[in-house]
A protein has these predicted regions:
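Unchanged
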Residues: 35-121
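A conserved beta-turn-beta hairpin within the catalytic core of GNAT-like acetyltransferases
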Residues: 23-29
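Glycine/small-residue-rich phosphate/adenosyl-binding loop
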Residues: 8-11, 15-18
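Generic C-terminal helix-cap and adjacent flexible tail
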Residues: 132-139
Length: 139
């Protein structure tokens, strides 16, 4: 089971998941994410996935917008939120889902984005948008 220390939930940390992606044949660091259930509200799905994957709830969320990752051939939408004020609950992974959870310092994750250590489009987009908000004092 993934471990999560209370120090991982500090507001200057980014709760990240590391999991093996079969299509790429490698492990990747990513932000928690998941799929919408039938007729599920995207915001409710974000809250559900955060608790399922990371075993936390959040006091507040900041809407970071919508991402269209593959506009040339797919209509997929990714809804992005930043979660603040994390509180531990319990993790509920799907059958066959294996991932590690860690709270990494914000600046370290941003550096991983800028040096291509993180290449997942939703994570890159979310981190850059949130960095911009932080720079403006809104994060």
């Amino acid at each position: 089971f993934p471990t999560r220390r209370s120090s991982d939930l500090d507001d200057d940390k980014v709760l990240m998941v590391r999991q093996y992606r079969y299509a790429l044949k490698e492990e990747l660091w990513e932000l928690p994410a998941g799929k919408l259930e039938k007729d599920e509200d995207p915001f409710e799905a974000a809250k559900r996935e955060l608790e399922e994957e990371c075993g936390v709830t959040a006091e507040r969320f900041i809407n970071l917008g919508v991402l269209y990752p593959t506009v040339g051939y797919d209509s997929e939408k990714i809804y992005i939120w930043a979660a603040k004020g994390l509180k531990p609950t319990s993790q509920h992974l799907d059958d066959g889902e294996f991932l590690d959870v860690a709270g990494l310092p914000f600046d370290d994750v941003l550096q991983m984005v800028m040096t291509d250590e993180i290449r997942d489009s939703k994570t890159v987009t979310a981190m850059l948008k949130y960095a911009w908000l932080r720079q403006r004092g809104e994060g």
